[in-house]
């Protein structure tokens, strides 16, 4: 997850010190002012994406869970879900994301949210927004959801409805967004980058401004579930889309709009941003590289900083990796499954850099990127450690002296050409 509005636009957001170790205004803070975070995979705790129902009232063309408006067997009961929340709270996970299917379809949605609140868990919900009326928005606000992420595929109602498989979905989703805004609930958009979305980016950013939306996350497509039937962006299309998002994000900040813009699920976005800032002579280029390296870079992602529990209680490295299961919460707590490295893939995810192959193995950014999204690589090639085909960096851009991710308390040297090396001595 790349916070474009912070790194490129210079926005100060509440999450900035936690994600990047410092406020954007701190050029080189002393060690005692930097955020203290675990520096090893074993000590990390994951954000847990919990697909606690597969049932959905829509049928989206890019749905990674292949959900439909039917009841599915084997989903966790209310008591089982509460036991999972108890374990996650004791384990110290930084956040739990209620997802689906459509999570608000579960009859016990609010009961589980209230239980999570009692445990002081940081809870987010990912929803299509069609079930959020004014009363639901007020209840969500009352239960102190940190954030409501609502899926949108286009600013054009016809295109959105076609993607969602239901006429009128756009208007119902927009009503849900407006109800959240009206009650003061933090709300944002979740958009998957497809050819339709990319051609619609100017209109989407106009909608963000017009509707006073707090946040927008642009997800690179992972071809899981029904998403495998969609054409992925070419590398040139990806670069154009990311450039457009960078530019629009900076413009929002310059005009005084405090909107968080993030890109998700392609970790080469970070190196690409730094290369662009370096090329443009941006005064914060060095600072941004340090911030990207903070917290171990993106190599601490799936299987370390991100985890997944599906509708039946199976545990996966992330929500796109349901083809591989490490255990089930009905048999063992998530905390035990997550720390068990007897499975070679789980062990590898926690120390992945030596296992990467192909262009990832020789890439100078691998300590920042971590080989990007392993699920996309494995779906495309059948090999866990193969290069991610979503990487749009050129061979020339990834060649050169490796960039070294140092501890947050260390200041590494910078080569004249912008490459970094570990401090000597």
Feature annotation, model-predicted:
Residues 288-298:
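Short, basic/aromatic recognition patches
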Residues 78-99, 105-240:
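Radical SAM/AdoMet-radical enzyme domain recognition
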Residues 309-310:
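Short, acidic, Ser/Thr-enriched surface-loop or helix-capping motifs
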Residues 300-304:
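Short, small/polar residue-rich loop motifs at catalytic or cofactor-binding pockets
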Residues 2-4, 10, 320-425:
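Flexible mid-to-C-terminal extensions adjoining Fe-S/redox cofactors in radical SAM and related proteins
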Residues 51, 190-191, 217-220, 262-265, ...:
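Short beta-strand segments
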Residues 2-147:
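Conserved alpha-helical substructure of the radical SAM core
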Residues 237-287, 314-364, 369-370:
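C-terminal accessory region of radical SAM enzymes
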């Amino acid at each position: 997850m790349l916070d474009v509005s912070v790194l490129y636009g210079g926005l100060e957001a509440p999450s900035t010190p936690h994600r990047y170790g410092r406020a954007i205004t701190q050029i080189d803070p002393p060690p005692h002012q930097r955020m203290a975070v675990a520096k090893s995979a074993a000590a990390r705790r994951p954000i847990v994406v919990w697909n606690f129902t597969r049932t959905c009232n829509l049928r989206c063309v890019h749905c990674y869970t292949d959900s439909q408006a039917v009841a599915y067997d084997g989903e966790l009961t209310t008591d089982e879900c509460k036991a999972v929340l108890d374990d996650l709270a004791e384990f110290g996970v930084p956040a739990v994301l209620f997802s689906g299917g459509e999570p608000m379809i579960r009859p016990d949605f609010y009961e589980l949210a209230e239980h999570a609140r009692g445990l002081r868990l940081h809870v987010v919900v990912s929803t299509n927004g069609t079930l959020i009326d004014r009363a639901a928005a007020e209840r969500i606000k009352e239960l102190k959801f940190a954030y409501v992420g609502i899926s949108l595929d286009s600013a054009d109602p016809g295109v959105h409805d076609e993607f969602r498989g239901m006429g009128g979905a756009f208007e119902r989703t927009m009503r849900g967004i407006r109800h959240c805004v009206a009650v003061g609930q933090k709300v944002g958009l979740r958009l998957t980058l497809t050819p339709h979305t990319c051609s619609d980016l100017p209109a989407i950013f106009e909608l963000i401004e017009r509707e006073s939306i707090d946040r927008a996350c642009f997800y690179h497509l992972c071809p899981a579930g029904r998403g495998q039937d969609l054409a992925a962006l070419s590398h040139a299309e990806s670069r154009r889309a990311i450039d457009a998002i960078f530019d629009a994000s900076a413009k929002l900040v310059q005009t005084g709009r405090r909107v968080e813009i993030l890109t998700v699920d392609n970790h080469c976005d970070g190196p690409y941003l730094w290369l662009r800032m370096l090329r443009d002579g941006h005064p914060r280029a060095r600072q941004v590289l340090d911030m990207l390296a903070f917290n171990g870079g993106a190599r601490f992602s799936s299987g370390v900083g991100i985890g997944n529990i599906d509708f039946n209680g199976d545990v996966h490295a992330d929500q796109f990796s349901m083809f591989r299961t490490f255990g089930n919460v009905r048999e063992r707590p998530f905390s035990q499954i997550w720390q068990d490295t007897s499975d070679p893939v789980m062990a590898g995810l926690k120390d992945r850099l030596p296992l990467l192959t192909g262009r990832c193995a020789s890439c100078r950014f691998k300590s920042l990127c971590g080989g990007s999204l392993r699920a996309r690589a494995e779906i495309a090639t059948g090999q866990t450690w193969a290069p991610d085909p979503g990487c749009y960096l050129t061979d020339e851009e990834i060649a050169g002296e490796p960039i070294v991710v140092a501890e947050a308390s260390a200041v590494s040297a910078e080569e004249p050409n912008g490459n970094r090396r570990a401090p000597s001595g």
